[in-house]
């Protein structure tokens, strides 16, 4: 994953660390307007300024961020994904979670986003052992939109629909691990997905990985 790259480590291997900077686009890059400008510890102000000018030229919304795993955007989204993964094992369905977050104002929920990116990002077929739900889905050939099915099933125009097969896979996965499932309402889904994101945002500010709260927003 690009957001796992260490700009400082890359810069340390060069003779001009002050000229090294990261431009992190979000997928799909031709649609998503956000651009993270990743400044290293030794990146010069002039290089940051030039990168901001490039962002403006290509009509992107730029946010200057520091070097940390996930940078800012993916670091915060990882908190949402982690909690969403717990929720589906406790009884919420992927589309219930996605719908709750979409209705709240997100352009896409975590499982629709996973399908768009591809469930096999970072997944290794050779070492997969079925220990995670992602392992089980990938082993079943459910890689996301590109394979026609992931958490959802897709038609030829990539329109998604809830899939009873996924519901059965989740139920079986939970039962095998003796996880007690229950009904989970929309309010709990929102609280559990949003609060960790907010907390992570404050941590990012405290660490100086973002200059201002509006950059995180």
Predicted region positions:
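N-terminal glycine-rich phosphate-binding loop for ADP-containing cofactors
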Residues: 1-217
């Amino acid at each position: 994953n690009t957001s796992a790259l260490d700009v400082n480590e890359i810069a340390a291997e060069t003779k001009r660390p002050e000229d090294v900077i990261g431009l992190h686009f979000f997928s799909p890059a031709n649609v998503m307007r956000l651009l993270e400008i990743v400044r290293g510890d030794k990146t010069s102000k002039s290089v940051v300024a030039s990168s901001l000018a490039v962002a403006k030229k290509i009509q992107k919304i730029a946010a200057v961020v520091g070097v940390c795993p996930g940078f800012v955007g993916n670091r915060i989204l990882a908190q949402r994904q982690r909690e969403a993964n717990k929720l589906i094992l406790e009884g919420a369905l992927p589309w219930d979670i996605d719908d709750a977050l979409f209705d709240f104002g997100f352009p896409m929920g975590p499982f629709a986003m996973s399908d768009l990116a591809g469930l096999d990002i970072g997944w290794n077929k050779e070492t997969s052992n079925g220990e995670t739900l992602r392992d089980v889905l990938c082993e079943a050939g459910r890689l996301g939109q590109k394979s026609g099915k992931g958490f959802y099933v897709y038609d030829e125009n990539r329109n998604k629909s809830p899939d009873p097969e996924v519901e059965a896979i989740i139920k079986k996965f939970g039962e095998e691990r003796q996880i007690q499932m229950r009904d989970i309402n929309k309010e709990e889904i929102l609280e559990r997905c949003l609060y960790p994101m907010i907390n992570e945002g404050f941590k990012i500010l405290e660490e100086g990985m973002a200059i201002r709260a509006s950059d995180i927003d």
